[in-house]
Regions:
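Short acidic-aromatic loop segments in the C-terminal HATPase_c
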Residues: 109, 124, 169
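Conserved ATPase "switch" residues in P-loop NTPase domains
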Residues: 25-26, 123, 127
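Short gly/ser/thr-rich secondary-structure transition/capping motifs
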Residues: 82-89, 125-130, 153
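Nucleotide-binding/hydrolysis machinery
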Residues: 2-6, 10-15, 52-57, 131-142, ...
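Conserved post-Walker A coupling segment in P-loop NTPases
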Residues: 6, 19-85, 96-112, 140, ...
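Conserved phosphotransfer active-site motifs of two-component signaling proteins
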Residues: 66-71, 90, 109-111, 135, ...
Length: 245
């Protein structure tokens, strides 16, 4: 099933975030998405891309926390052969891969100051320079960045470039945690339950018993929608009698 079908809810804060994404999508300006883990930051990036004029160009994703600091710049901006130990051949970076499309940078706060400086140049001038080269390469990339860090506080401490934060904040979309999305636990529980039941080829979805539904709604869900989805899918998979709630 398509990932964007999981992007559902009825709470005001959630719908406001979706509306802001829809309104910003047609533009090529940077967007900063703020939210806890599991709230759907990557889904917002996909929505921004698919509703834009770049929809048929690449959507390239990079998790800035998934690589050691020594490799992040080479991964983002590419490198020439011999630029560092192990670089046996030239390689394009994520910016070049995303040319004419969208680059989604998750966990933005993990970027080193050196990588932030290079990123700022890419945003301001539309060009990148591979590691080991002095030749700038023109790129046309729309940037969507995401974080759960307090970037303004990091900027005050000198841990994040204030000028980069300003350039990436043309539109800021804040995704609410599931615990404050009134009514959405029930909506999502039913959706994930029905989807898993269909995958198991049940002829009907009995739903959860009222006391179970209350427990689900009372839980704080620190892992947000991702945690809820995993819990519901496992529960349905292990269901003893699909005829009974």
């Amino acid at each position: 099933m398509e990932r964007d079908n999981q992007f559902i809810g009825q709470s005001g804060a959630f719908l406001d975030a979706v509306e802001r994404a829809s309104r910003a999508a047609p533009m090529s300006r940077p967007v900063l998405v703020i939210g806890e883990r599991g709230t759907g930051k990557e889904l917002i990036a996909e929505r921004l891309h698919r509703l834009s004029t770049r929809w048929d160009e690449p959507l390239v994703t990079m998790n800035c926390a998934a690589l050691p600091e020594t490799l992040i710049e080479a991964e983002l901006f590419g490198h020439e052969a011999g630029a560092f130990t192990g670089a046996t051949r030239a390689r394009a970076g994520r910016f070049e891969e995303a040319d004419k499309g969208t680059l989604f940078l998750d966990e933005l706060g993990n970027l080193s100051m050196a990588a932030q400086e290079r990123l700022l140049r890419a945003v301001e001038y539309g060009e990148v320079t591979r590691i080991g080269s002095s030749r700038p390469i023109r790129v046309d990339v729309r940037i969507v960045a995401a974080t759960n860090d307090d970037l303004p506080a990091m900027a005050e401490r000198g841990e994040f470039r204030a000028d980069l934060l300003d350039r990436l904040s043309f539109e800021v979309i804040t995704l609410p945690p599931l615990r404050v999305r009134e009514g959405d636990v029930g909506v999502l529980t039913d959706y994930f339950g029905r989807r898993m039941a269909a995958e198991l080829e049940w002829h009907a979805w009995p739903g959860f018993a009222p006391h179970v539904q209350r427990q689900l709604e009372d839980y704080t869900w620190p892992g947000n929608v991702r945690e809820l989805r995993n819990v519901i899918e496992r529960a349905v998979y292990r269901w003893d009698d699909p005829e009974q709630p």
